[in-house]
């Protein structure tokens, strides 16, 4: 046998790393073709055998001409790339992609049990325990794909294959089916519309995982009843039933299961139960296998631990290649070669029950996608647990309950320093606002978003030399992120650059004073003054001028002084008292605050990472904060935001967004649930990301973020966009 040489990369190779192509009537690459298993939208599905290992695979053949005629080539590339990321026990695996001049060959896992639809037709309704077991597997696979930002949109029993060896189901065609063009459901779906959500058959624009939740509800109903909740020989009557959402559940279905089905088959997609809520439903939790108990228990795509028995078999199959060379090829990251494919084929062909493999070293936790956080309340990826009250600092959630004070600030030990941070505490030997005294008063952390004003009479100082015997661990970190985070609130701009907010601080220690100071034109002649003033004449050392525009992002100008720290009498024996001395200034996405108004005059918001504020009126004219004389090379990288609030339903908002984008001259693509990536058709160097968030009940935020281009072009474009939008 000749020595092993890696096959040349095909035309898809740069993206997929597929092997070389040998095509005859029976051979494609390293596979020998066999009988036809079925015919799909783009071509046939063939049974094949991997020549080296003898493992059976299914090869989906996609005809290039059909793909081109349907204008689906770019979507095919993107969805194939998504599918190659999937390594889940209940999703059909895609091992590699081979390309010829006429066809694309997707080498996939072969499952021998056939379609679940045929099983139900043959055996009738399933027992509730069996239905629950299969439903748990299906939801786990759907949840995994949603975490990878792929929505199926055509789930049905025909796309669920039975694996008789492992006694489980596997989702097929996941990722390819969501290439359907909106409004063309009946033309592109070769199956029945009985499983489609109301928003799909109505031709409304949709983008989220809620359509899969509906389909899963219909499938669960079919498991239990061997019939469909919505069925009619007349397609118009069928659509009418689906839109109305009226169905009956037989008495033999348990009340808990019936409750879950009803919550999944809610016509309004916003009110429909989410995957996360399904996982927590009492009926779903019964007899839930350990390996399905967490959405983050997935098989790793990379080979982290090599199975010795599989390795020994490969040494024999690929002789005379030595063992070390095989190990080297298997451990190559971000690459697919024949040895890696062979290893996965052998592992999968010998794998027993997945329930026995939960402790396998190949089981890892995936990277969680922020926009699909399981903690979200609805399919739209943004929630808030508090009202829009800018005057109440307690309305901002505290996400840090330990003793590590991650600061949004900088402690300065220099003289005459000017700072534009949210808050400054200036004291020698005090780092990161964390003060440790040697009199059992430990870890008294000053809230970062505060301002200390010390005038001539040393206000807010407790002259007891810190002789407190309280063992308090007071952490007042408000990790609030603005645009793209978990808290949203509105701010009213003051054109005099004075922002007043009476905040109620948190006090856990004794002798606590919570002050909100905003003084002007003060002459301070003392040391260690921390001023939040305009036009101050300071004649002292260690003066820190915290000029203008502070504490805007957190809407909190209060001082939370735990045990009232005396700035001139601190007995500190440690110059580095914080466990985490890093600056934590970056909100998600970064950017400066943009205060603007919607068509109703309501103030909107943006994100800030350094306290600077850009005030915009309805014409989006820049008022302040931009230093036009500074060297752009010396400025930190910023991402700019604009936004608009609406109370329209999400699908209507998305429809209005599409209309406005087309009117202004954008082209776009869907990159996630309720998320669009846009660029100008006329070639203007500007790229945007649009994201729709739910910020309250029946209240939605359209966030517009610049990811490329000049800031003033961004302002002009957004001005046109927001004028065009009718929200």
From Swiss-Prot:
Reactions the enzyme catalyzes: L-seryl-[protein] + ATP = O-phospho-L-seryl-[protein] + ADP + H(+); L-threonyl-[protein] + ATP = O-phospho-L-threonyl-[protein] + ADP + H(+)
Listed GO CC annotations: endocytic vesicle
Domain KA1: 679-727
Protein kinase domain residues: 31-284
Residues engaged in binding ATP: 37-45, 60
One GO biological process term: cellular response to diterpene
Post-translational modification Phosphothreonine, affected residues: 188
InterPro entries with a match to the protein in the record: AMPK_C, KA1/Ssp2_C, KA1_dom, Kinase-like_dom_sf, Prot_kinase_dom, Protein_kinase_ATP_BS, Ser/Thr_kinase_AS
Protein name, UniProt field: 5'-AMP-activated serine/threonine-protein kinase catalytic subunit alpha
Protein source organism: Dictyostelium discoideum
């Amino acid at each position: 046998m000749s020595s092993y040489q890696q096959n040349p990369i095909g035309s898809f190779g740069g993206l997929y790393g597929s092997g070389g192509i040998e095509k005859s009537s029976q051979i494609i690459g390293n596979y020998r073709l066999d009988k036809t298993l079925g015919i799909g939208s783009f071509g046939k599905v063939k049974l094949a055998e991997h020549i080296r290992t003898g493992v059976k695979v299914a090869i989906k053949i996609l005809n290039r001409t059909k793909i081109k005629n349907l204008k689906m080539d770019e979507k095919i590339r993107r969805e194939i790339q998504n599918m190659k990321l999937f390594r889940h026990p209940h999703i059909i695996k895609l091992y590699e992609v081979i390309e010829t001049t006429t066809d694309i060959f997707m080498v996939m896992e072969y499952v021998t049990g056939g379609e679940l639809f045929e099983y139900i037709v043959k055996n009738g309704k399933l027992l509730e325990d069996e239905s629950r077991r299969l439903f748990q597997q299906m939801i786990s696979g759907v949840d995994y794909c949603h975490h990878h930002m792929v929505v199926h949109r055509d789930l049905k029993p025909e796309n669920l294959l039975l694996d008789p060896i492992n006694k489980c189901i596997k989702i097929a065609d996941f990722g390819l089916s969501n290439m359907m063009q909106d409004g063309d459901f009946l033309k592109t779906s070769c199956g029945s519309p009985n499983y489609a959500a109301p928003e799909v058959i109505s031709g409304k624009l949709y983008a989220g995982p809620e359509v899969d939740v509906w389909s899963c509800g219909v499938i669960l109903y079919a498991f239990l009843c061997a019939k469909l909740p919505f069925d009619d020989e007349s397609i118009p009557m069928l659509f009418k039933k689906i839109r109305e959402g009226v169905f009956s559940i037989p008495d033999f279905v348990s009340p808990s299961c019936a409750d879950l089905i009803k919550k999944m088959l809610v016509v309004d997609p916003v009110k429909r139960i989410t995957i996360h809520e399904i996982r927590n439903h009492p009926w779903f939790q019964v007899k839930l296998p350990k390996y399905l108990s967490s959405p983050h228990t997935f098989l790793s795509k990379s080979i982290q631990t090599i199975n010795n028995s599989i390795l020994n078999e490969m040494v024999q199959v690929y002789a005379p290649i030595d063992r070390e060379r095989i190990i080297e090829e298997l451990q190559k990251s971000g690459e697919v070669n024949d040895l890696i494919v062979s290893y996965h084929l052998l592992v999968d062909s010998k794998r027993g029950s997945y329930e026995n493999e939960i402790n396998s070293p190949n089981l890892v936790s995936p990277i969680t996608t922020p926009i699909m956080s399981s903690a979200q309340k609805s399919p739209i990826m943004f929630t808030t647990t508090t009202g829009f009250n800018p005057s109440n600092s307690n309305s901002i959630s505290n996400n840090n309950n330990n003793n590590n004070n991650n600061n949004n600030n900088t402690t300065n030990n220099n003289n005459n320093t000017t700072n534009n941070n949210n808050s400054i505490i200036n004291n020698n030997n005090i780092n990161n606002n964390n003060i440790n005294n040697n009199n059992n008063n430990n870890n008294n952390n000053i809230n970062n978003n505060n301002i200390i004003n010390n005038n001539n009479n040393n206000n807010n100082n407790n002259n007891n030399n810190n002789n407190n015997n309280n063992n308090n661990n007071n952490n007042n970190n408000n990790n609030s992120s603005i645009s793209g985070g978990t808290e949203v609130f509105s701010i009213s701009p003051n054109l005099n650059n004075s922002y007043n907010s009476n905040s109620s601080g948190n006090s856990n220690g004794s002798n606590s004073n919570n002050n909100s100071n905003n003084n002007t034109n003060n002459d301070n002649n003392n040391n260690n003054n921390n001023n939040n003033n305009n036009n101050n004449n300071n004649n002292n050392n260690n003066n820190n001028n915290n000029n203008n525009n502070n504490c805007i992002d957190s809407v909190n100008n209060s001082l939370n002084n735990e045990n009232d720290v005396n700035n001139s009498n601190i007995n500190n024996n440690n110059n580095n008292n914080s466990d985490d001395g890093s600056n934590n200034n970056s909100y998600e996405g970064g950017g400066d605050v943009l205060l603007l108004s919607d068509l109703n005059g309501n103030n909107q918001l943006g994100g800030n990472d350094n306290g600077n504020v850009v005030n915009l009126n309805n014409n989006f004219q820049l008022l302040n904060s931009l230093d036009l004389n500074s060297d752009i090379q010396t400025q930190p990288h910023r991402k700019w935001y604009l936004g608009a609030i609406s109370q329209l339903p999400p699908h209507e908002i998305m429809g209005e967004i599409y209309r406005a984008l087309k009117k202004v001259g954008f082209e776009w693509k869907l990159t996630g649930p309720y998320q669009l990536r846009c660029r100008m058709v006329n070639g203007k160097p500007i790229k945007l990301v649009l994201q729709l968030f739910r910020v309250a009940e029946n209240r939605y935020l359209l966030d517009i973020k610049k990811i490329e281009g000049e800031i003033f072009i961004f302002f002009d474009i957004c001005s046109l966009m927001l004028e065009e939008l009718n929200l």
